[in-house]
Protein backbone atom coordinates (compact mmCIF):
# COMPACT_ATOMS: atom_id res chain seq x y z
CA UNK A 1 0.00 0.00 0.00
CA UNK A 2 1.34 3.42 -0.97
CA UNK A 3 0.53 6.58 0.99
CA UNK A 4 1.12 10.11 -0.25
CA UNK A 5 2.95 12.44 2.14
CA UNK A 6 3.77 16.12 2.03
CA UNK A 7 7.35 15.47 1.00
CA UNK A 8 7.79 11.74 0.45
CA UNK A 9 5.97 8.55 -0.47
CA UNK A 10 5.68 5.95 2.28
CA UNK A 11 5.08 2.28 1.47
CA UNK A 12 5.54 0.68 4.89
CA UNK A 13 2.49 1.93 6.81
CA UNK A 14 0.54 -0.70 8.73
CA UNK A 15 -3.04 -0.12 9.89
CA UNK A 16 -5.35 -1.90 12.30
CA UNK A 17 -8.79 -1.04 13.64
CA UNK A 18 -9.29 -1.63 17.35
CA UNK A 19 -12.74 -0.01 17.54
CA UNK A 20 -15.72 -0.32 15.17
CA UNK A 21 -18.97 1.57 15.84
CA UNK A 22 -21.87 -0.73 16.65
CA UNK A 23 -19.76 -3.60 17.94
CA UNK A 24 -18.83 -5.01 21.36
CA UNK A 25 -21.84 -3.51 23.12
CA UNK A 26 -21.34 0.12 22.10
CA UNK A 27 -23.18 2.16 19.49
CA UNK A 28 -20.21 4.46 18.96
CA UNK A 29 -16.56 4.89 19.86
CA UNK A 30 -15.16 8.41 20.10
CA UNK A 31 -12.31 10.47 21.61
CA UNK A 32 -9.14 8.36 21.15
CA UNK A 33 -6.06 8.50 23.38
CA UNK A 34 -2.97 6.29 23.20
CA UNK A 35 0.15 5.73 25.30
CA UNK A 36 2.93 3.16 25.45
CA UNK A 37 4.25 1.56 28.61
CA UNK A 38 7.89 1.88 29.54
CA UNK A 39 10.46 0.53 31.97
CA UNK A 40 10.46 2.44 35.28
CA UNK A 41 13.33 4.90 35.76
CA UNK A 42 12.45 6.11 39.26
CA UNK A 43 14.57 4.79 42.14
CA UNK A 44 13.65 1.30 43.31
CA UNK A 45 13.07 1.28 47.08
CA UNK A 46 13.01 -2.49 47.57
CA UNK A 47 15.91 -4.86 46.89
CA UNK A 48 15.71 -7.12 43.86
CA UNK A 49 16.99 -10.63 44.62
CA UNK A 50 17.03 -11.93 41.06
CA UNK A 51 17.30 -10.32 37.62
CA UNK A 52 13.98 -9.13 36.22
CA UNK A 53 13.10 -9.61 32.56
CA UNK A 54 12.02 -6.30 31.08
CA UNK A 55 8.63 -6.68 29.38
CA UNK A 56 8.12 -5.43 25.86
CA UNK A 57 6.30 -2.09 25.64
CA UNK A 58 2.53 -2.33 25.45
CA UNK A 59 0.34 0.11 23.56
CA UNK A 60 -2.82 1.18 25.34
CA UNK A 61 -5.61 2.58 23.13
CA UNK A 62 -8.34 4.35 25.08
CA UNK A 63 -11.59 5.91 23.89
CA UNK A 64 -15.14 6.60 24.93
CA UNK A 65 -17.53 3.69 24.45
CA UNK A 66 -20.94 5.29 23.92
CA UNK A 67 -23.62 2.75 24.74
CA UNK A 68 -26.82 4.08 23.22
CA UNK A 69 -25.84 6.57 20.52
CA UNK A 70 -23.03 8.76 19.21
CA UNK A 71 -24.17 11.70 21.38
CA UNK A 72 -21.67 13.45 23.65
CA UNK A 73 -23.87 12.74 26.69
CA UNK A 74 -25.59 9.61 27.95
CA UNK A 75 -24.26 6.27 29.17
CA UNK A 76 -20.57 6.43 28.29
CA UNK A 77 -17.66 4.29 29.53
CA UNK A 78 -13.93 4.72 29.01
CA UNK A 79 -12.75 1.58 27.26
CA UNK A 80 -9.29 0.22 26.49
CA UNK A 81 -7.60 -2.24 24.19
CA UNK A 82 -3.97 -3.34 24.61
CA UNK A 83 -1.44 -4.30 21.94
CA UNK A 84 1.81 -6.13 22.58
CA UNK A 85 2.98 -6.13 18.95
CA UNK A 86 3.25 -2.44 18.20
CA UNK A 87 -0.37 -1.89 17.22
CA UNK A 88 -0.66 -4.63 14.61
CA UNK A 89 -3.23 -6.57 16.66
CA UNK A 90 -5.28 -5.76 19.75
CA UNK A 91 -6.52 -7.65 22.78
CA UNK A 92 -10.06 -7.77 24.14
CA UNK A 93 -12.00 -4.65 25.08
CA UNK A 94 -11.87 -3.58 28.74
CA UNK A 95 -14.17 -1.02 30.35
CA UNK A 96 -11.67 0.69 32.67
CA UNK A 97 -13.73 3.66 33.89
CA UNK A 98 -17.45 3.28 34.47
CA UNK A 99 -19.93 5.64 36.11
CA UNK A 100 -22.90 3.32 36.36
CA UNK A 101 -25.31 4.29 33.60
CA UNK A 102 -23.90 7.81 33.55
CA UNK A 103 -20.87 9.32 31.81
CA UNK A 104 -17.14 8.70 32.21
CA UNK A 105 -15.19 10.31 29.38
CA UNK A 106 -12.41 12.49 28.02
CA UNK A 107 -9.59 10.02 28.78
CA UNK A 108 -6.25 11.73 29.47
CA UNK A 109 -3.73 8.92 30.13
CA UNK A 110 -0.07 9.44 30.94
CA UNK A 111 2.69 6.91 31.65
CA UNK A 112 4.91 8.00 34.55
CA UNK A 113 8.62 7.42 35.05
CA UNK A 114 7.70 4.78 37.63
CA UNK A 115 5.77 2.79 35.05
CA UNK A 116 2.44 3.69 36.65
CA UNK A 117 -0.27 4.78 34.22
CA UNK A 118 -2.53 7.62 35.34
CA UNK A 119 -5.95 8.04 33.76
CA UNK A 120 -7.42 11.48 34.37
CA UNK A 121 -10.99 11.87 33.11
CA UNK A 122 -14.34 13.54 33.69
CA UNK A 123 -17.67 12.22 34.94
CA UNK A 124 -21.18 13.62 34.69
CA UNK A 125 -24.82 12.62 34.82
CA UNK A 126 -26.06 10.95 31.65
CA UNK A 127 -28.68 13.64 31.09
CA UNK A 128 -26.28 16.57 31.48
CA UNK A 129 -26.04 17.85 27.91
CA UNK A 130 -23.41 20.39 26.93
CA UNK A 131 -26.09 22.97 26.15
CA UNK A 132 -27.72 22.57 29.56
CA UNK A 133 -24.35 22.81 31.34
CA UNK A 134 -23.39 25.95 29.40
CA UNK A 135 -26.71 27.56 30.31
CA UNK A 136 -26.25 26.77 34.00
CA UNK A 137 -29.19 24.39 34.16
CA UNK A 138 -27.24 21.46 35.64
CA UNK A 139 -26.51 21.29 39.36
CA UNK A 140 -22.83 20.87 40.28
CA UNK A 141 -23.28 17.29 41.49
CA UNK A 142 -24.51 16.28 38.02
CA UNK A 143 -22.08 18.44 36.04
CA UNK A 144 -18.59 17.80 34.77
CA UNK A 145 -16.39 16.52 37.59
CA UNK A 146 -12.76 15.36 37.50
CA UNK A 147 -11.42 11.97 38.56
CA UNK A 148 -8.17 10.00 38.40
CA UNK A 149 -7.26 6.33 38.66
CA UNK A 150 -4.13 4.33 37.94
CA UNK A 151 -2.70 1.03 36.78
CA UNK A 152 0.57 -0.54 37.88
CA UNK A 153 0.45 -3.54 35.55
CA UNK A 154 0.41 -2.02 32.06
CA UNK A 155 -3.34 -1.51 32.04
CA UNK A 156 -4.43 -5.01 32.99
CA UNK A 157 -6.07 -3.87 36.23
CA UNK A 158 -7.03 -0.43 37.53
CA UNK A 159 -7.44 1.24 40.90
CA UNK A 160 -10.70 2.65 42.16
CA UNK A 161 -11.23 6.21 40.87
CA UNK A 162 -10.52 9.19 43.11
CA UNK A 163 -12.28 12.53 42.68
CA UNK A 164 -10.08 15.64 42.38
CA UNK A 165 -12.71 18.18 41.29
CA UNK A 166 -12.16 20.42 44.29
CA UNK A 167 -8.45 20.75 43.49
CA UNK A 168 -8.76 21.65 39.80
CA UNK A 169 -12.17 23.17 39.03
CA UNK A 170 -13.05 26.66 40.23
CA UNK A 171 -16.49 27.45 41.59
CA UNK A 172 -18.61 28.96 38.84
CA UNK A 173 -16.95 27.15 35.95
CA UNK A 174 -19.62 25.40 33.91
CA UNK A 175 -18.33 23.15 31.13
CA UNK A 176 -15.12 21.25 31.92
CA UNK A 177 -13.03 18.81 29.90
CA UNK A 178 -9.60 17.22 30.01
CA UNK A 179 -7.43 17.13 26.84
CA UNK A 180 -8.66 14.85 24.87
CA UNK A 181 -5.63 12.69 24.09
CA UNK A 182 -2.60 11.80 26.18
CA UNK A 183 -1.26 14.01 28.97
CA UNK A 184 2.48 14.53 29.59
CA UNK A 185 5.05 14.08 32.34
CA UNK A 186 7.85 16.64 32.13
CA UNK A 187 11.53 15.97 32.72
CA UNK A 188 11.11 17.47 36.19
CA UNK A 189 8.55 14.79 37.03
CA UNK A 190 5.59 17.17 36.90
CA UNK A 191 2.43 15.85 35.27
CA UNK A 192 0.62 18.31 32.99
CA UNK A 193 -2.94 17.68 31.83
CA UNK A 194 -4.38 20.33 29.48
CA UNK A 195 -8.02 21.23 30.05
CA UNK A 196 -10.75 23.63 29.07
CA UNK A 197 -13.75 25.19 30.75
CA UNK A 198 -16.40 27.85 30.28
CA UNK A 199 -17.20 30.89 32.37
CA UNK A 200 -20.64 32.00 33.54
CA UNK A 201 -22.13 34.63 31.21
CA UNK A 202 -22.71 38.30 31.82
CA UNK A 203 -25.53 40.61 30.76
CA UNK A 204 -28.11 38.97 28.54
CA UNK A 205 -25.77 36.22 27.30
CA UNK A 206 -26.82 32.61 27.82
CA UNK A 207 -23.42 31.00 28.40
CA UNK A 208 -23.43 29.22 25.04
CA UNK A 209 -21.41 31.98 23.38
CA UNK A 210 -17.93 30.93 22.25
CA UNK A 211 -16.28 33.88 24.00
CA UNK A 212 -16.74 32.14 27.36
CA UNK A 213 -14.55 29.20 26.28
CA UNK A 214 -11.33 29.24 28.31
CA UNK A 215 -8.20 27.17 28.84
CA UNK A 216 -6.29 25.82 31.82
CA UNK A 217 -4.12 22.89 32.83
CA UNK A 218 -3.92 20.50 35.77
CA UNK A 219 -0.57 19.95 37.50
CA UNK A 220 0.75 17.28 39.83
CA UNK A 221 4.24 17.28 41.36
CA UNK A 222 3.81 14.00 43.27
CA UNK A 223 2.89 11.60 40.47
CA UNK A 224 -0.84 12.11 40.73
CA UNK A 225 -1.34 12.03 44.49
CA UNK A 226 -2.37 15.70 44.68
CA UNK A 227 -3.31 18.25 42.04
CA UNK A 228 -3.45 21.98 41.44
CA UNK A 229 -4.39 24.37 38.67
CA UNK A 230 -1.64 25.70 36.43
CA UNK A 231 -2.23 28.48 33.94
CA UNK A 232 -5.77 29.80 33.49
CA UNK A 233 -6.37 31.64 30.21
CA UNK A 234 -9.68 33.53 30.28
CA UNK A 235 -10.48 36.33 27.88
CA UNK A 236 -14.05 37.07 26.85
CA UNK A 237 -13.25 39.39 23.94
CA UNK A 238 -14.16 36.54 21.57
CA UNK A 239 -10.96 36.70 19.52
CA UNK A 240 -9.39 33.42 20.65
CA UNK A 241 -11.70 30.90 22.31
CA UNK A 242 -9.62 28.06 23.73
CA UNK A 243 -11.23 24.64 23.68
CA UNK A 244 -9.73 21.14 23.52
CA UNK A 245 -5.99 21.44 24.17
CA UNK A 246 -2.90 19.26 23.80
CA UNK A 247 0.64 19.73 25.15
CA UNK A 248 4.25 18.68 24.58
CA UNK A 249 7.54 19.40 26.35
CA UNK A 250 10.03 20.95 23.93
CA UNK A 251 13.75 20.07 23.94
CA UNK A 252 14.56 23.36 25.71
CA UNK A 253 12.20 22.51 28.59
CA UNK A 254 9.36 24.83 27.63
CA UNK A 255 5.85 23.42 27.39
CA UNK A 256 4.00 24.03 24.14
CA UNK A 257 0.19 24.10 24.19
CA UNK A 258 -1.96 23.93 21.06
CA UNK A 259 -5.72 24.39 21.25
CA UNK A 260 -8.84 24.12 19.15
CA UNK A 261 -9.95 27.71 18.57
CA UNK A 262 -13.72 28.12 18.42
CA UNK A 263 -13.53 31.69 17.17
CA UNK A 264 -15.72 30.77 14.22
CA UNK A 265 -18.68 30.75 16.59
CA UNK A 266 -18.04 34.37 17.64
CA UNK A 267 -20.86 36.69 16.78
CA UNK A 268 -20.38 39.84 14.68
CA UNK A 269 -19.22 42.53 15.06
CA UNK A 270 -16.47 40.81 17.06
CA UNK A 271 -13.26 40.30 15.03
CA UNK A 272 -12.43 36.71 14.17
CA UNK A 273 -8.91 35.39 14.54
CA UNK A 274 -7.41 33.64 11.50
CA UNK A 275 -7.75 29.89 11.31
CA UNK A 276 -9.06 27.37 13.80
CA UNK A 277 -5.96 26.76 15.96
CA UNK A 278 -4.20 28.79 18.64
CA UNK A 279 -1.06 28.13 20.68
CA UNK A 280 0.98 29.28 23.66
CA UNK A 281 4.20 28.47 25.53
CA UNK A 282 4.99 28.07 29.21
CA UNK A 283 8.48 28.58 30.65
CA UNK A 284 7.59 27.33 34.14
CA UNK A 285 6.15 23.89 33.54
CA UNK A 286 2.60 24.99 32.84
CA UNK A 287 2.19 27.18 35.90
CA UNK A 288 1.77 30.28 33.69
CA UNK A 289 1.81 31.15 30.00
CA UNK A 290 4.46 33.44 28.52
CA UNK A 291 1.63 35.04 26.50
CA UNK A 292 -2.06 34.15 26.26
CA UNK A 293 -3.16 31.87 23.45
CA UNK A 294 -2.74 33.51 20.06
CA UNK A 295 -3.83 32.34 16.57
CA UNK A 296 -1.74 29.69 14.81
CA UNK A 297 -2.78 30.12 11.18
CA UNK A 298 0.10 27.91 10.04
CA UNK A 299 -2.02 24.89 10.94
CA UNK A 300 -4.89 24.69 8.47
CA UNK A 301 -7.67 22.64 10.06
CA UNK A 302 -11.41 22.60 10.58
CA UNK A 303 -12.73 23.23 14.10
CA UNK A 304 -11.57 20.00 15.74
CA UNK A 305 -9.28 18.49 18.36
CA UNK A 306 -5.63 17.81 17.51
CA UNK A 307 -2.66 15.98 19.04
CA UNK A 308 1.00 16.82 19.72
CA UNK A 309 4.09 14.64 20.11
CA UNK A 310 7.67 15.82 20.58
CA UNK A 311 10.28 13.56 19.00
CA UNK A 312 13.85 13.71 20.31
CA UNK A 313 15.62 11.76 17.60
CA UNK A 314 15.15 13.76 15.44
CA UNK A 315 14.04 16.87 17.36
CA UNK A 316 10.71 17.43 15.64
CA UNK A 317 7.36 18.50 17.06
CA UNK A 318 4.44 16.63 15.48
CA UNK A 319 0.81 17.69 15.15
CA UNK A 320 -1.98 15.42 13.89
CA UNK A 321 -5.39 16.51 12.69
CA UNK A 322 -7.60 16.91 9.62
CA UNK A 323 -6.20 19.31 7.00
CA UNK A 324 -9.39 20.24 5.16
CA UNK A 325 -10.29 23.70 6.52
CA UNK A 326 -14.01 23.22 5.90
CA UNK A 327 -14.60 19.59 6.87
CA UNK A 328 -13.36 16.91 9.23
CA UNK A 329 -11.33 15.06 6.61
CA UNK A 330 -7.82 14.58 5.21
CA UNK A 331 -5.97 13.33 8.32
CA UNK A 332 -2.44 14.73 8.16
CA UNK A 333 0.66 14.84 10.35
CA UNK A 334 2.42 18.22 10.34
CA UNK A 335 5.92 18.88 11.72
CA UNK A 336 7.66 21.86 13.30
CA UNK A 337 11.41 22.24 13.80
CA UNK A 338 11.13 25.51 15.75
CA UNK A 339 8.93 24.70 18.73
CA UNK A 340 5.59 25.29 17.04
CA UNK A 341 6.29 28.64 15.38
CA UNK A 342 6.08 27.30 11.83
CA UNK A 343 4.61 24.08 10.45
CA UNK A 344 4.80 22.01 7.29
CA UNK A 345 2.81 18.96 6.15
CA UNK A 346 4.82 15.75 6.39
CA UNK A 347 2.45 12.80 6.05
CA UNK A 348 -1.07 12.61 4.64
CA UNK A 349 -2.94 9.49 5.69
CA UNK A 350 -5.70 9.71 3.05
CA UNK A 351 -8.54 11.94 1.90
CA UNK A 352 -11.28 10.21 3.88
CA UNK A 353 -13.42 11.74 6.62
CA UNK A 354 -11.42 11.95 9.86
CA UNK A 355 -11.72 13.80 13.17
CA UNK A 356 -10.04 13.35 16.58
CA UNK A 357 -6.61 11.74 16.92
CA UNK A 358 -3.69 11.01 19.22
CA UNK A 359 0.02 10.42 18.57
CA UNK A 360 2.43 8.04 20.32
CA UNK A 361 6.05 6.96 19.87
CA UNK A 362 5.84 3.22 19.28
CA UNK A 363 9.58 2.54 19.01
CA UNK A 364 12.72 4.18 17.69
CA UNK A 365 11.62 3.81 14.09
CA UNK A 366 7.86 4.23 14.37
CA UNK A 367 5.21 6.75 15.36
CA UNK A 368 1.65 5.60 15.98
CA UNK A 369 -1.51 7.52 15.08
CA UNK A 370 -4.85 6.56 16.66
CA UNK A 371 -7.62 8.41 14.87
CA UNK A 372 -11.33 8.56 14.07
CA UNK A 373 -12.15 7.80 10.44
CA UNK A 374 -14.51 6.08 8.03
CA UNK A 375 -15.52 5.80 4.40
CA UNK A 376 -18.76 7.76 4.75
CA UNK A 377 -18.21 9.66 7.99
CA UNK A 378 -15.42 10.28 10.50
CA UNK A 379 -16.94 8.29 13.37
CA UNK A 380 -17.26 4.82 11.86
CA UNK A 381 -14.03 3.47 13.36
CA UNK A 382 -11.05 4.33 15.49
CA UNK A 383 -8.05 3.16 13.49
CA UNK A 384 -4.37 2.81 14.39
CA UNK A 385 -1.63 3.51 11.85
CA UNK A 386 2.08 2.82 12.18
CA UNK A 387 4.08 5.61 10.49
CA UNK A 388 7.83 5.33 9.88
CA UNK A 389 9.76 8.17 11.48
CA UNK A 390 11.64 8.49 8.20
CA UNK A 391 8.37 9.50 6.52
CA UNK A 392 8.17 12.55 8.80
CA UNK A 393 11.65 13.97 8.31
Give the location of each predicted region.
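Asp-box/BNR beta-propeller blade signature and adjacent active/binding-site loops
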Residues: 6-47, 51-393
Amino acid sequence: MTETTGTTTATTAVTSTPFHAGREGYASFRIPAVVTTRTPTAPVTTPVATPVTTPAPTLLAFCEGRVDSAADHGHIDIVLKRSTDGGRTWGPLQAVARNGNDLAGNPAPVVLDTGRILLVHVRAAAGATEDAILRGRVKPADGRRVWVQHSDDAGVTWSAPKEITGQVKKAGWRWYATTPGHAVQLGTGRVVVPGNHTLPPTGTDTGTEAKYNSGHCLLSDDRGETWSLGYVDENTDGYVNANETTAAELPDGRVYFNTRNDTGRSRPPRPQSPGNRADAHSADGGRTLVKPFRPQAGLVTPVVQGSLLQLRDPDLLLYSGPADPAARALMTVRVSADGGTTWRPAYTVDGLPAAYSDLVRVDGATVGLLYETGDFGPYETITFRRIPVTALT
